[in-house]
Amino acid sequence: MAARGETPEVETREDEEQGVKLAEILELLVAAGYFRARIKGLSPFDKVVGGMTWCITTCNFDIDVDLLFQENSTIGQKIALTEKIVSVLPKMKCPHRLEPHQIQGLDFIHIFPVIQWLVKRAIETRQEMGDYIRSYSVSQFHKEHSLPEDQDFELRREKTVRTLSETLDVYRPRRKYKRQGGSSELMDEESRVHSTLLEYGRRYGLSKQMKPEKPEDRRVPVPQGLVGKGEVREEEEELRAEEELRIKALMTEMAATGMEEGRLTASTVGQIVGLQSKEIKQMVSEYAEKQSELSAEDRAEYLGAAQQHRRKVASLSKLIGQRKKLLDQLQEKASELQSGCGETRKQLTEVTSHMEKLDQELSVLENMESKADPSVLQKLRDLVAQNESLKAQEQQFRSKCREEMSRLQQNIDGLKAAATEHGEEKEQTQAFEQQYKAEREKLQKIRLLLARRNREIAILQRKIDEVPSRAELTQYQKRFIELYGQVSATHKETKQFFTLYNTLDDKKVYLEKEVNLLNSIHDNFQQAMASPSARDQFLRQMEQIVDGIRQSRNKMEKKKQENKMKRDQLNDEYLELLEKQRLYFKTVKEFKEECRKNETLLSKMKGPTP
């Protein structure tokens, strides 16, 4: 048990792998931006814990730590700090587990994955914050300022919008034809849609003003599976004829909008002229009929393109049907393969989990074997080997006994058969029974001996388990040191509470005295002011009270100065002890280095001379 006021040293693993991991951790922290890890005067614990705290705060997570750096912390303070760090890691969804004693014991092999993950998370958070701050700065800049390109755009915007609206107004859809008032009403929706498109000069997307296509452009690419089929051609011809009749019927019921709007009706002409109304009406109707016939003849030129589109749609529809069937078949095969793949993945995950479980058990057994005492372990191995050999001998003996018993049983059966024939079985039967009893007793003795040996092995194994190993003793020592630190911290805190209580109690007593004095002055003031003698006596009493208060105050000031001097003296002693402690640690380190050099020189001197 370490003496009070001294900082106990914790046993740490100082092998090559731990040193390599520490160097990698420091390189990661420096690369991430934690340059305090370069300071050579800091201990590895301060560098690692400081780097972890810096990464956690960079990731915008709160951690309850002391902002003021304190060198040579006690075991209790280190445990409290590591527990706070470990409690924050699950909140950050860290995939690696870490215990406080691993950080305190400087187990860099287990600390390295956590540091690696924290550095990666800190860099990602810093990049996200940089992007956010950059976008926020750009938005604030655009709110207050504008670029020359934006100013030019605002100047040209109004003119551009006006030009665009005029262009849209010029090229907007215009009605070129209109159904006549006396035409029959269309019943189905497709005919109404087709009629409306024809009124605006469009036939399935082809404008009236477009030039007729060339014969080679009108050729429809026929799929490979439809070449040379007469039924498709006949169907296309029928569709073409039906479409031509349909368009012709629709166009005969329409008239040009400009002609109809510019035409004067018979009633209007009669009202204006007042004579020959019938002749004018007849001429106007004849003119309208001629105009409709001419417009119908003009539209006949564009019927071929629509029928060609119909044929293309029919051929492509059949090709789409074939492709859909093929797609359904491929989807069924894909679903079957997907289900098989899912089962295979499930089996793979089961096998992988089983392998991981076996690896974990094997690593636990290897760890236990490395921590155990070599001599006790070798003795236990010898006993286990002896037990295994005895078991093997028992199995061999049992197999031999079974073979011997079967052979003897065969002999008995043969002898019984021979005895029944010759009548000489009694003596042989008795001899065999005696031999059987002897072998049975021998087997029972061997079983008792084996049970006694197994019991001795179990007793020795329990005794071995009761003896603590070196690792367990080290763990007990660490725990006792931690408990001592916690007890000392609790004692210090309790002492502070007692001091605070005594201070507050003294303050309460002085306040009560002050209140009683003020109440007494208030009660006797009127009576003392009634006569001069009473007033003089009252003033003398007040002067005596003030003198007493001054004396008490001087005593307290003197006591305060004494305590302050004592505190300064203790602080100086504490600083001297700290300096001695630093010198002690430095001397121990130099002594270890000299011992290492001495061992190196001795090993070189003992080496074989050439």
From Swiss-Prot:
Pfam families cross-referenced by the UniProt entry: CCDC93_CC, CCDC93_N
GO-annotated cellular components: early endosome
Coiled coil: 229-467, 511-580
Superkingdom of source: Eukaryota
UniProt entry tagged with the keyword Transcription regulation: no
Cellular localization per UniProt: Early endosome
Keywords tagged on the record: Coiled coil, Endosome, Protein transport, Transport
GO biological process, one term: protein transport
Membership in a protein family: Belongs to the CCDC93 family.
Function in brief: May be involved in copper-dependent atp7a trafficking between the trans-Golgi network and vesicles in the cell periphery.
Protein name: Coiled-coil domain-containing protein 93
Gene (name only): ccdc93
